[in-house]
């Protein structure tokens, strides 16, 4: 399975959703020194550790 590429809107939605989860106490999926939820989410995204998928509708 190839890695899915996300556009800027999908990436923003994924990072925002994950940052909200982290801010509510969800476990962090990678080792990081960051404390800000959005920065934690960004590092997880860069590491490919986020369990999110995007379903695109075909016309």
Swiss-Prot record:
Transmembrane segments: none
Gene Ontology, cellular component aspect: cytoplasm; DNA-directed RNA polymerase complex
Subcellular localization: Cytoplasm
InterPro entries in the cross-refs: Pol_omega/Rpo6/RPB6, RPB6/omega-like_sf, Rpo6/Rpb6
EC numbers on record: 2.7.7.6
Catalysed reactions listed for this entry: RNA(n) + a ribonucleoside 5'-triphosphate = RNA(n+1) + diphosphate
GO BP annotations, alphabetical order: transcription by RNA polymerase I; transcription by RNA polymerase II; tRNA transcription by RNA polymerase III
Keyword NADP recorded: no
GO molecular function: DNA binding; DNA-directed RNA polymerase activity
Domain of life (superkingdom): Archaea
Keywords tagged on the record: Cytoplasm, DNA-directed RNA polymerase, Nucleotidyltransferase, Transcription, Transferase
Chief location: cytoplasm
Subunit structure: Part of the RNA polymerase complex.
Similarity comment: Belongs to the archaeal Rpo6/eukaryotic RPB6 RNA polymerase subunit family.
Function: DNA-dependent RNA polymerase (RNAP) catalyzes the transcription of DNA into RNA using the four ribonucleoside triphosphates as substrates.
Protein name, UniProt field: DNA-directed RNA polymerase subunit Rpo6
Organism, scientific name: Halorubrum lacusprofundi (strain ATCC 49239 / DSM 5036 / JCM 8891 / ACAM 34)
Lineage: Archaea, Methanobacteriati, Methanobacteriota, Stenosarchaea group, Halobacteria
The gene coding this protein: rpo6
